[in-house]
Amino acid sequence: MSATPPSASTDFKHFFGAVPTDQNALDLFAGEWSSSPPSDRPDLKAGVTPLFDDPRIAWAHHRLMDMGVENGFTGRDVLELGPLEGGHTYLIDRLNAAAVTAVEANARAYLKCLIAKETFRMSARVRFLLGDCLAHLRTVDQTHDIAVASGLLYHLTNPVELLELLARRSNAIFLWTVFYDPDFVAQNPVPGAKFSEQLPMEHAGFKHTVHRFNYGPSLDWKGFCGGGDIYSYWMEKKEIIAALEHFGFRDFRTEQHPNVHGSALMLVARK
């Protein structure tokens, strides 16, 4: 069953009689932004999460260099899946990636990415595409130097397919995801209540267990940035890493930290 957001229509104002400003563009989606503007634009107001100043991209950049990916993102062909509002795209572009192709399935998020590209002066090396990232990976026969998937894995109903396709279409990856942590769920009944069952699954020869997460009332928010269904399947940390190994990744750098929704894994890997 697919989620049908109540905000399916384009409901922002069609004409502005005021002086043109960058804030006007951000205000097309007033109340829907997750990201705050870059720190060098304190004059602008949007969301509250500092994704345009996110240290995770610098972390990935340096860990990639540590494992022998010369210059990290710099000079690399990068595929980004689920850019949300373009914050990580902006940071990778500022590291002078040779090209960034960012695929976003959420139509409102895609439009916010275009606003961010214009407002925050991303380069012509950045291209945003509207569509399903899994369909893109299945059909576009291209191998990228680095693939980035931040905040995506735990919004899918077949997360291992994403890991398989990342291995097929990239030589190195940066992955950030929340994962199913039974200790966290036991100690935090509110987010824990959103999990309803666990199921055995198999994809491309990899057997694993997934835990159903139900979005619930979150689906009613115009700025909802989850998946396209009313639920998703979460994996445990050890099985995420095991799946990547199964599909050919051999060198890993990982870091775990707490998150409001559960334990989070930050990972770079290369073949």
Predicted segments with their positions:
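Glycine-rich SAM-binding Motif I of class I
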Residues: 82-90
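N-terminal, positively charged/glycine-rich alpha-helical extensions of SAM-dependent methyltransferases
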Residues: 2-45
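Conserved alpha-helix/loop element of class I SAM-dependent methyltransferases that forms part
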Residues: 53-74
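Class I SAM-dependent methyltransferase SAM/SAH-binding core
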Residues: 91, 95-123
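Class I SAM-dependent methyltransferase Rossmann-like catalytic core
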Residues: 43-57
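S-adenosyl-L-methionine-dependent methyltransferase catalytic module, highlighting the catalytic core
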Residues: 134, 138, 149, 157-270
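Conserved SAM-binding strand-loop segment of SAM-dependent methyltransferases
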Residues: 122-133
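Short SAM/SAH-binding signature in class I
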Residues: 143-151
